[in-house]
Amino acid sequence: MKFLLSNDDGYFAPGLAMLAQTLQRYGEVVVVAPERDRSGASNSLTLDRPLTVRKAANGFHYVNGTPTDCVHLAVTGFLDFRPNMIFTGINHGPNMGDDTLYSGTVAAATEGFMLGIPSVAVSLAGHSGKHFASAGKVVEQLVERCLEEPFQQPVLLNVNVPDAPPEEVGALQVTRLGRRHAAQPVIKSQNPRGETIYWVGPVGAVQDAGAGTDFGCVASKQVSVTPLMLDLTAYGQLDRISTWLHR
């Protein structure tokens, strides 16, 4: 198999190194990742300047752009082959519920899916960063399952792995996205010149972590696998909005 890898933590991130190390056992691996941390970049593309691709000492390619730039550039012009699968991550921190809308890791996988390639975003759902090997084991399971029964059409999967030793990580479970409460207010401060500055505040507390959610799954030390889709249409509101417009 031929794999394209990317992330949003930057080409130097330990999670990306673990992902590459894991997938090299199964085929050809090419890494095209941002030159710096682009967490929270979501699906943004760089349109106001050209992009450059450079090669690091470890063989990874890095781009002066967003995670979505990396995958788009790689698939549509940089690579001389079409990847069989795209993996993004292993993200240092969870990407669950509403987080998926902001995540560059999920966005990079989404770009691959939009280009017709099965794509998987993988995150280590904790901030200690101690157990990337556990996420690597999960990637192995997913690839081996794909080898046994390949996807017949492109899929987009969001995978969150508990930040725990491999022996403590439970089975893979198919989940839906949970929800958070609204984010906390921005943090207002001053720089040394006395100018007012703002930092984006912490994420909101978990609101929906019930049965079947990604939050609930990871809290029980199981692996959350959430199939994602791109259609944002609120079908349940079509009739109501139509009535409102034409009343």
From Swiss-Prot:
Enzyme class: hydrolase
Record-stated family: Belongs to the SurE nucleotidase family.
Disulfide bonds: none
GO molecular function, one term: metal ion binding
Function: Nucleotidase that shows phosphatase activity on nucleoside 5'-monophosphates.
Cofactor mode of binding and number, as noted: Binds 1 divalent metal cation per subunit.
Catalytic activity: a ribonucleoside 5'-phosphate + H2O = a ribonucleoside + phosphate
Gene Ontology CC terms: cytoplasm
Keywords: Cytoplasm, Hydrolase, Metal-binding, Nucleotide-binding
Annotated EC: 3.1.3.5
Cofactor: a divalent metal cation
Positions that bind a divalent metal cation: 8-9, 39, 91
Natural source organism: Chromobacterium violaceum (strain ATCC 12472 / DSM 30191 / JCM 1249 / CCUG 213 / NBRC 12614 / NCIMB 9131 / NCTC 9757 / MK)
Entry-linked InterPro entries: SurE (IPR030048), SurE-like_Pase/nucleotidase (IPR002828), SurE-like_sf (IPR036523)
Protein's cellular compartments: Cytoplasm
Gene name tied to this protein: surE
Pfam family, one: SurE
Taxonomic classification: Bacteria, Pseudomonadati, Pseudomonadota, Betaproteobacteria, Neisseriales
Name of the protein in its database record: 5'-nucleotidase SurE
